[in-house]
A protein has these predicted regions:
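Conserved small-residue
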Residues: 1-102
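C-terminal beta-signal and terminal closure region of outer-membrane beta-barrel proteins
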Residues: 8-41, 160-167, 184, 230-265
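Extracytoplasmic gating/loop element in the C-terminal half of outer-membrane beta-barrel translocons
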Residues: 48-50, 54-56, 64, 68-70, ...
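Outer-envelope beta-barrel architecture signal
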Residues: 108-110, 119-121, 195, 217-221, ...
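Membrane-embedded beta-strand positions in outer-membrane beta-barrel channels/transporters
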Residues: 111-113, 201-205, 258-260
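Membrane-embedded beta-strand positions of outer-membrane beta-barrel proteins
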Residues: 125, 223-225, 261
């Protein structure tokens, strides 16, 4: 956690680990729907979202009950806005409506090696895996919220809400959240099951028969090719499922191919 001083000048701890909580657990909001049209607004008439920094978002039913001063401090729910899961059913979304996404620490890790030799031909393969964990794709959140300035965005932006795409998967796209709707807050749409199986190393070598080696005046000659970090089987949207908790600051593990010749004279 962090040590901070409250208004009374007392030193307190904020954040950090919670006693009795599972280590590595991740919590976030759960997006359950999108306002598809003006008519659809009535389905969320009593919806209230207190999390946007520019003011609470109100469904049209609640909005109609507010005074002019209260409306000036808030926002009216609009088509394209995300709808988040209300955990306790009080029609108000706040920090207590975050739900468990999973654990960022793999529950199971392991690997397997395979080695086969046949008539001078050798095959070696090494696979490893991690399963039972989730990872936060914070880069996806950053780009989907259009916080990257003039840089390009993701292909998912083609599946964001608009009047022409009312059934899109993602909320309305808005440059740098200029209307402070907070539709792209950290939620389930930015968490993936990052379980993976990796072909960590595959090596193939061939030792020429001695009679062939003698043709080129050698006692033994072995040629080989080795590939490392070749590919992943995974459902993760991260560049690499081994990034860790949120994918920030990570760089993909390089895929390498090595060729070798071993000669004995």
């Amino acid at each position: 956690g962090q040590q901070v001083y409250n208004a009374a000048g007392d030193l307190i701890w904020v954040g950090g680990k919670q006693e009795g909580q599972e280590y590595g657990v991740a919590y976030a909001y759960r997006m359950i729907d999108i306002v598809r049209s003006e008519a659809d607004l009535q389905n969320f008439a009593w919806y209230v979202d207190t999390t946007p920094s520019s003011g609470t978002i109100y469904g049209p039913g609640v909005w109609a009950t507010l005074t002019a001063d209260e409306q000036a401090k808030g926002q009216l729910l609009q088509p394209g806005d995300a709808i988040f899961y209300d955990v306790n059913g009080d029609n108000t979304i706040d920090q207590y409506d975050q739900v468990k996404m999973g654990n960022t620490v793999p529950r199971w890790v392991g690997g397997v090696n395979l080695s086969v030799d046949w008539k001078g031909l050798s095959l070696y393969a090494r696979f490893d895996f991690a399963t039972g964990y989730v990872a936060q794709n914070s880069r996806k959140q950053y780009y989907m919220a259009l916080s990257q300035g003039t840089f390009n965005t993701l292909k998912e932006s083609k599946d964001t809400w608009s009047e022409e795409r009312p059934n899109a998967k993602y909320p309305i796209l808005m440059y740098a959240d200029t209307k402070f709707r907070n539709n792209y807050r950290m939620s389930n749409i930015f968490y993936d099951d990052s379980s993976y199986l990796c072909a960590r190393e595959i090596a193939l070598s061939y030792s020429l028969p001695e009679r062939w080696a003698r043709v080129v005046r050698m006692k033994n000659l072995t040629v080989s090719v080795t590939g490392q970090n070749l590919f992943y089987w995974t459902g993760s949207s991260l560049y690499n499922p081994e990034y860790g908790v949120n994918g920030n600051g990570g760089y993909a593990i390089p895929r390498t191919v090595l060729f070798g010749i071993k000669a004995t004279f």
